């Protein structure tokens, strides 16, 4: 196992798995470490060798949240996905939307606006990319935002979305095209 020293904490890497031995997160933007634990186990003799095993698993996060997860039913044999679980594709789209929303709301606040609600029905498109690999190539955010008090102009909303997109850590980390189709509250 190789080790990377981050401040005074050690993080181990064994193959593709990262093991956190303790956490020190900086607030200055220079470095932060985030973890998730993904758990799956085979349930008896369920046709594993033939690909007929459950894709249901769980994601656990450092704050204590445990989320049921599964492969998308669109990508695995029928009956092997748990449709109630969050699939990685949905989580990817939600993480982009959530990051954008959090920055948008904060920038609106800084501009003296009051956001009452923000609902985004984001959609992602999975298809072959330019290299012929299956990827989420496009995510369209479709936020509906309701403000109290002073109402922003459509230009101001566009500028807030641009600032939010430029600041979003997730958007800065992916090659997926991200579009925003702002909708009237």
Language-model-derived ranges and their functions:
Residues 12-17:
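Short hydrophobic alpha-helical segments enriched in small aliphatic residues
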Residues 18-22:
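Compositionally biased, low-complexity segments
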Residues 23-94, 103-185:
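Extended beta-strand/beta-hairpin segments
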